[in-house]
Protein backbone atom coordinates (compact mmCIF):
# COMPACT_ATOMS: atom_id res chain seq x y z
CA UNK A 1 0.00 0.00 0.00
CA UNK A 2 1.55 3.05 -1.22
CA UNK A 3 0.42 6.42 -0.03
CA UNK A 4 -0.29 9.04 -2.61
CA UNK A 5 2.58 11.47 -2.98
CA UNK A 6 0.48 14.57 -3.10
CA UNK A 7 -2.77 15.43 -1.43
CA UNK A 8 -5.73 16.21 -3.59
CA UNK A 9 -6.04 19.94 -4.14
CA UNK A 10 -9.15 21.93 -4.14
CA UNK A 11 -9.77 24.66 -6.66
CA UNK A 12 -9.42 27.38 -3.97
CA UNK A 13 -5.69 26.86 -3.82
CA UNK A 14 -5.35 26.86 -7.53
CA UNK A 15 -3.85 29.54 -9.64
CA UNK A 16 -4.89 32.99 -8.51
CA UNK A 17 -6.08 35.41 -11.06
CA UNK A 18 -4.04 38.58 -11.64
CA UNK A 19 -5.51 41.85 -10.44
CA UNK A 20 -6.15 44.47 -12.98
CA UNK A 21 -4.54 47.91 -12.85
CA UNK A 22 -7.84 49.42 -11.76
CA UNK A 23 -8.15 47.08 -8.78
CA UNK A 24 -4.54 47.75 -7.73
CA UNK A 25 -5.13 51.51 -7.88
CA UNK A 26 -8.29 51.20 -5.77
CA UNK A 27 -6.46 49.17 -3.07
CA UNK A 28 -3.66 51.76 -2.97
CA UNK A 29 -6.20 54.57 -2.52
CA UNK A 30 -7.82 52.66 0.36
CA UNK A 31 -4.43 52.14 2.08
CA UNK A 32 -3.61 55.84 1.68
CA UNK A 33 -6.96 56.87 3.13
CA UNK A 34 -6.34 54.68 6.19
CA UNK A 35 -2.85 56.14 6.70
CA UNK A 36 -4.17 59.69 6.62
CA UNK A 37 -6.00 59.21 9.94
CA UNK A 38 -3.00 58.15 12.01
CA UNK A 39 -1.88 61.56 13.41
CA UNK A 40 -3.10 63.71 16.26
CA UNK A 41 -6.50 65.30 16.21
CA UNK A 42 -6.67 68.73 14.58
CA UNK A 43 -6.11 71.54 17.09
CA UNK A 44 -4.57 69.24 19.69
CA UNK A 45 -1.62 71.57 20.19
CA UNK A 46 -3.81 74.51 21.16
CA UNK A 47 -6.14 72.37 23.27
CA UNK A 48 -3.38 71.27 25.61
CA UNK A 49 -2.32 67.95 24.13
CA UNK A 50 -3.65 65.81 27.01
CA UNK A 51 -7.25 65.73 25.84
CA UNK A 52 -7.23 61.96 25.25
CA UNK A 53 -5.68 60.91 28.57
CA UNK A 54 -7.32 63.31 31.02
CA UNK A 55 -10.89 63.54 29.78
CA UNK A 56 -12.52 64.54 33.10
CA UNK A 57 -9.68 66.82 34.13
CA UNK A 58 -10.09 69.40 31.37
CA UNK A 59 -12.03 71.94 33.42
CA UNK A 60 -9.23 72.23 35.99
CA UNK A 61 -6.37 72.69 33.52
CA UNK A 62 -5.04 76.16 32.84
CA UNK A 63 -5.26 77.66 29.42
CA UNK A 64 -1.71 77.57 27.98
CA UNK A 65 -2.32 80.83 26.12
CA UNK A 66 -2.52 82.78 29.37
CA UNK A 67 0.89 83.87 30.52
CA UNK A 68 2.39 85.16 33.73
CA UNK A 69 0.49 87.58 35.92
CA UNK A 70 3.59 89.48 37.05
CA UNK A 71 3.50 93.12 36.02
CA UNK A 72 5.87 94.16 33.27
CA UNK A 73 7.33 97.69 33.41
CA UNK A 74 6.41 99.56 30.26
CA UNK A 75 8.72 102.54 30.63
CA UNK A 76 12.49 102.70 30.51
CA UNK A 77 13.83 102.21 34.01
CA UNK A 78 17.41 102.25 35.16
CA UNK A 79 18.74 99.01 36.42
CA UNK A 80 19.25 99.18 40.16
CA UNK A 81 22.58 97.69 41.12
CA UNK A 82 22.81 96.37 44.61
CA UNK A 83 25.87 97.44 46.50
CA UNK A 84 28.04 94.61 47.68
CA UNK A 85 27.98 94.65 51.45
CA UNK A 86 31.17 93.43 53.05
CA UNK A 87 30.69 90.71 55.58
CA UNK A 88 30.37 92.25 58.96
CA UNK A 89 33.14 91.08 61.19
CA UNK A 90 32.27 89.79 64.59
CA UNK A 91 32.54 92.55 67.14
CA UNK A 92 35.73 92.28 69.11
CA UNK A 93 34.99 91.40 72.70
CA UNK A 94 37.19 92.49 75.51
CA UNK A 95 39.49 89.72 76.74
CA UNK A 96 37.54 89.50 80.00
CA UNK A 97 34.19 89.16 78.17
CA UNK A 98 35.59 86.53 75.83
CA UNK A 99 37.04 84.62 78.76
CA UNK A 100 33.66 84.72 80.52
CA UNK A 101 31.97 83.38 77.39
CA UNK A 102 34.46 80.53 77.10
CA UNK A 103 34.14 79.63 80.78
CA UNK A 104 30.34 79.42 80.51
CA UNK A 105 30.34 77.49 77.22
CA UNK A 106 28.04 74.48 77.66
CA UNK A 107 29.57 72.41 74.88
CA UNK A 108 33.06 72.88 76.29
CA UNK A 109 31.87 71.92 79.78
CA UNK A 110 30.13 68.79 78.47
CA UNK A 111 33.18 67.68 76.50
CA UNK A 112 35.51 68.31 79.46
CA UNK A 113 33.21 66.24 81.70
CA UNK A 114 33.34 63.42 79.16
CA UNK A 115 37.14 63.62 79.14
CA UNK A 116 37.27 63.51 82.95
CA UNK A 117 35.00 60.46 82.89
CA UNK A 118 37.58 58.70 80.72
CA UNK A 119 35.77 58.78 77.39
CA UNK A 120 37.69 59.34 74.20
CA UNK A 121 36.48 62.15 71.98
CA UNK A 122 36.39 62.21 68.21
CA UNK A 123 39.30 63.93 66.49
CA UNK A 124 37.09 66.88 65.56
CA UNK A 125 35.80 67.35 69.12
CA UNK A 126 39.28 66.93 70.59
CA UNK A 127 40.70 69.55 68.22
CA UNK A 128 37.86 71.94 69.14
CA UNK A 129 38.47 71.44 72.88
CA UNK A 130 42.22 71.97 72.43
CA UNK A 131 41.63 75.19 70.48
CA UNK A 132 39.25 76.55 73.12
CA UNK A 133 41.61 75.65 75.98
CA UNK A 134 44.51 77.31 74.14
CA UNK A 135 42.39 80.43 73.68
CA UNK A 136 41.53 80.44 77.39
CA UNK A 137 45.26 80.21 78.22
CA UNK A 138 46.03 83.14 75.89
CA UNK A 139 43.29 85.28 77.42
CA UNK A 140 44.39 84.47 80.95
CA UNK A 141 47.96 85.47 80.08
CA UNK A 142 46.71 88.75 78.57
CA UNK A 143 44.73 89.49 81.71
CA UNK A 144 47.61 88.48 83.98
CA UNK A 145 45.73 85.57 85.48
CA UNK A 146 46.93 82.03 85.99
CA UNK A 147 45.53 78.83 87.40
CA UNK A 148 47.85 79.00 90.40
CA UNK A 149 47.01 82.62 91.31
CA UNK A 150 43.76 81.61 92.97
CA UNK A 151 45.43 78.90 95.03
CA UNK A 152 48.31 81.16 96.03
CA UNK A 153 45.95 83.97 97.01
CA UNK A 154 43.94 81.59 99.16
CA UNK A 155 47.10 80.25 100.79
CA UNK A 156 48.42 83.76 101.43
CA UNK A 157 45.08 84.80 102.93
CA UNK A 158 45.08 81.74 105.18
CA UNK A 159 48.65 82.44 106.31
CA UNK A 160 47.79 86.05 107.13
CA UNK A 161 44.70 84.96 109.04
CA UNK A 162 46.77 82.42 110.99
CA UNK A 163 49.35 85.12 111.82
CA UNK A 164 46.60 87.49 112.98
CA UNK A 165 45.10 84.77 115.19
CA UNK A 166 48.47 84.07 116.74
CA UNK A 167 49.10 87.74 117.40
CA UNK A 168 45.64 88.38 118.82
CA UNK A 169 45.50 85.69 121.32
CA UNK A 170 46.11 82.30 119.93
CA UNK A 171 42.49 81.22 119.56
Swiss-Prot record:
Positions of region (Disordered): 1-99, 145-171
Keywords from the named record: GTPase activation, Ribosome biogenesis
UniProt GO MF annotations: GTPase activator activity
An annotated GO BP: ribosome biogenesis
Acidic residues: bias regions: 147-160
Segments of skewed composition (Basic and acidic residues): 20-30
InterPro entries with a match to the protein in the record: YihI
Basic residues: bias regions: 31-40
Complexes and interactors: Interacts with Der.
NCBIfam families: PRK05244.1-1 (NF003560)
Primary role: A GTPase-activating protein (GAP) that modifies Der/EngA GTPase function. May play a role in ribosome biogenesis.
Annotated family: Belongs to the YihI family.
Record protein name field: Der GTPase-activating protein YihI
Source organism of this protein record: Salmonella paratyphi C (strain RKS4594)
Amino acid sequence: MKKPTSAPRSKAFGKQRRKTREELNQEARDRKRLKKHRGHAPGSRAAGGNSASGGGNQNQQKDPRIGSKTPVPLGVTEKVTQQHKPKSEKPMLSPQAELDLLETDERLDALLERLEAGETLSAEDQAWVDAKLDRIDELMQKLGLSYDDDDEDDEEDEKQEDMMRLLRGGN
